[in-house]
């Protein structure tokens, strides 16, 4: 019996019919707190890693080795005043940052951390993740419009066009995973990657989706960078043009919510990439299967987040027309062609996804 089953059984005996509600709330709170801590130290890791790439130390003054820097940053933002522009639409202005961060948290309901460890093991988990993550576009448009500022609205329009453009390519990449796994359930998608010739010989990582679906994996991950408005796709908040884009009129904790949503979405994109293409909680080699699955998932997510940061430190920002061209003229045709290729592959005698 797993730890989760033990806690569940003990709680059911103790609290009776009220236990399912209490257990659901406890799990949601635990996941939310862990995500907030991950965001805090992801920001520190980003500053440290970019510092090393620039041949400097990065934050190292607050606490031993700078470990308390995230706490200082949070306190600074909490203590700053939220200044609302006079011409802004009051309630819409305040709702926008909340609408940005809520979907970022909500996606975690269906992401499995290891076998049987998921908040909601729904059969349409992949569809749910795609639908919920799309809501962030409305929050960005709302923030730009409610601020009643030309620069904020321009940034919001850029963000909306960019996010919608790359969602199409990302959607086709996920269709490929659906085709090969035959399921929208994320746990079953992970399970479908644990079979095949290489997995039978103990080399699990060669059975994961990243290899046969490599173009889709690359398109998905780069589209994820564009979806989160990260460098080199950050024309939404281009410092040399419109500064912070749709967030330009936000300050204090309202601005911090946008910042929080961006980093949570980075972790979500990495967690989904690890789940759909890198075997989720599966160990890369069979002889390492004794290590808990959540360790492998965290390691894969950390590696993908480090790639996010490496891309930021390495590449120059694209022009807006280059971003649109990449999305519509490169990624979309590549994913459509690969859908056809994989469809023919699955219908041929060389089908490697035979159930």
UniProtKB/Swiss-Prot annotation:
Name one cellular component (GO) term: plasma membrane
Q: Which family does it belong to?
A: Belongs to the complex I subunit 1 family.
**Role summary:** NDH-1 shuttles electrons from NADH, via FMN and iron-sulfur (Fe-S) centers, to quinones in the respiratory chain. The immediate electron acceptor for the enzyme in this species is believed to be ubiquinone. Couples the redox reaction to proton translocation (for every two electrons transferred, four hydrogen ions are translocated across the cytoplasmic membrane), and thus conserves the redox energy in a proton gradient. This subunit may bind ubiquinone.
Main location as per UniProt: membrane
Transmembrane domains' residue ranges? 25-45, 91-111, 126-146, 170-190, 205-225, 253-273, 290-310, 330-350
GO molecular function annotations of the record: NADH dehydrogenase activity; oxidoreductase activity, acting on NAD(P)H, quinone or similar compound as acceptor; quinone binding
Catalysed reaction(s)? a quinone + NADH + 5 H(+)(in) = a quinol + NAD(+) + 4 H(+)(out)
A GO BP entry is: aerobic respiration
**How does this chain assemble?**
NDH-1 is composed of 14 different subunits. Subunits NuoA, H, J, K, L, M, N constitute the membrane sector of the complex.
For this entry, the protein name equals NADH-quinone oxidoreductase subunit H
Q: What class of enzyme is it?
A: translocase
- Originating species: Burkholderia cenocepacia (strain ATCC BAA-245 / DSM 16553 / LMG 16656 / NCTC 13227 / J2315 / CF5610) (Burkholderia cepacia (strain J2315))
Q: How does it sit in the membrane?
A: Multi-pass membrane protein
Q: Which PANTHER family match?
A: NADH DEHYDROGENASE SUBUNIT 1, NADH-UBIQUINONE OXIDOREDUCTASE CHAIN 1
Q: Which Pfam families match?
A: NADHdh
Q: Does the keyword Translocase apply?
A: yes
Write down the EC number.
7.1.1.-
Subcellular location(s) per record: Cell inner membrane
Please give the InterPro entries that the UniProt record associates with this protein: NADH_UbQ_OxRdtase_su1/FPO (IPR001694), NADH_UbQ_OxRdtase_su1_CS (IPR018086)
Which keywords does this chain's UniProt record carry? Cell inner membrane, Cell membrane, Membrane, NAD, Quinone, Translocase, Transmembrane, Transmembrane helix, Ubiquinone
């Amino acid at each position: 019996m797993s730890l989760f089953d033990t806690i569940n059984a003990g709680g059911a005996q103790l609290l009776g019919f009220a236990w399912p509600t209490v257990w659901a709330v406890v799990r949601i709170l635990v996941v939310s707190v862990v995500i907030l801590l991950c965001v805090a130290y992801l920001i520190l890791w980003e500053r440290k890693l970019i510092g090393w790439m620039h041949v400097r130390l990065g934050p190292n003054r607050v606490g031993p080795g700078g470990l308390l820097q995230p706490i200082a940053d949070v306190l600074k933002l909490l203590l700053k005043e939220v200044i609302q522009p006079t011409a802004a639409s009051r309630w819409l202005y305040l709702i926008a940052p909340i609408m940005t961060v809520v979907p970022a948290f909500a996606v975690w309901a269906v992401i499995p951390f290891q076998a049987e460890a998921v908040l909601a093991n729904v059969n349409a988990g992949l569809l749910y993740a795609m639908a919920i993550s799309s809501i962030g576009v409305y929050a960005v448009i709302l923030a730009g419009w409610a601020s009643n500022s030309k620069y904020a609205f321009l940034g919001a329009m850029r963000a909306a066009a960019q996010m919608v453009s790359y969602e199409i390519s990302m959607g086709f990449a996920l269709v490929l995973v659906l085709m090969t796994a035959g399921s929208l359930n994320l746990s079953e998608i992970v399970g479908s990657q644990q079979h095949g010739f290489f997995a039978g010989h103990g080399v699990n990582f060669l059975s994961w989706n990243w290899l046969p679906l490599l173009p889709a994996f690359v398109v998905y991950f780069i589209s994820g960078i564009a979806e989160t408005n990260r460098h080199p796709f950050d024309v939404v908040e281009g410092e040399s043009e419109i500064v912070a884009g749709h967030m330009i009129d936000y300050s204090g904790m309202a601005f911090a919510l946008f910042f929080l949503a961006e980093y949570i979405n980075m972790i979500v994109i990495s967690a989904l990439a690890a789940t759909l293409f890198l075997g989720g909680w599966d160990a890369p080699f069979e002889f390492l299967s004794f290590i808990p699955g959540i360790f492998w998932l965290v390691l894969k997510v950390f590696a993908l987040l480090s790639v996010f940061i490496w891309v930021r430190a390495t590449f120059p920002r694209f022009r807006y027309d280059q971003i649109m061209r990449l999305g519509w003229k490169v990624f979309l045709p590549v994913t459509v062609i690969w859908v056809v290729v994989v469809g023919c592959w699955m219908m041929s005698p060389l089908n490697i996804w035979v159930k």
